[in-house]
Amino acid sequence: MVKKIGLITSGGDSPGMNACIRAVVRTARAEHIDVVGFYRGYEGLIDDDHIHLTKSKVSNIIHRGGTILKTARSKRFMTPEGIQMAVNTLQKHQLDGFVIIGGDGSFRGAQELTKHTDIKTVGCPGTIDNDLVGTDFTIGYDTAINTVVEAVDKIRDTAESHDRIFVVEVMGRDAGLIALRSAIACGAEAILIPERKNDLRTLLDRKKTWRQTKKSRIIIVAEGDENGGAVGIGNLLKLEWPEFDIRISILGHIQRGGNPTCMERVNASLM
């Protein structure tokens, strides 16, 4: 019988993590299960930096971005000593289960943890990259793409006013799903993602066509693109297309913040 579980948020933060924390705690408490939260992911597990989570401690957080448990990437956890310290913490608190909210790296950590303990472990997919199997949408993805769409719509306004081409970089080191979906929603004229190689040549071949039609364009690039992201591509286009006014915009960490969307809150609550 499960009496007590542990909970962490790990890796890069994503909007909706707080909604998921709330759902875990409220569901557990409804079954009279205690929840111990550890701060800063696996780092907090190693250091036993914990808090006893109650329904009152997770009230009014469903709408907030970030994570009340903080998050981090832990190099110590990848060492035998670090893993043993984490296992010792789990045993000290007599946990019957352990919940990890995070991305692929966090799940690999959970997999490693299960090799050293028989505690039942559950992973909730929390990453803006949407690159985990088993779910159509990870926690954070919907909010991130909505943030991108809002930003690119504004960039489109100024691009149109000045007849400029904007190369916009979005997050996605190994996965181009943020770039792909937001490009469709924004009506971007071109997209470059890690999953498709050699698309830059196709883009360069559009020079004649683009010169004869409208002058303002949006090119969305995933940061993991093989050509060096927006900076690499933008600088190359400036050399290849000197007649165009080309600007570079990197959206950065705004994609990981902000209030989660309605869809995000519902998905995170149901997971």
Residue ranges and their predicted role:
Residues 1-46:
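N-terminal phosphate-binding or glycine-rich loops at protein starts, especially the Walker A/P-loop
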Residues 10-13, 38-44, 73-74, 103-105, ...:
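Short, ordered loop/turn segments at secondary-structure junctions
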Residues 13-24, 46, 80-81, 98-111, ...:
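Short glycine/serine/threonine-rich phosphate/pyrophosphate-binding segments
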Residues 22-31, 51-57, 112-122, 139-143, ...:
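A glycine- and small-aliphatic-rich helix-loop capping segment at beta-alpha/alpha-beta transitions
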Residues 45-100, 105-106, 139-150:
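Glycine-rich oxoanion-binding loops at beta->alpha junctions
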Residues 100-102, 108, 112, 117, ...:
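Accessory alpha-helical/coil subdomains and C-terminal extensions
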Residues 238-271:
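C-terminal non-catalytic interaction/assembly regions of soluble proteins
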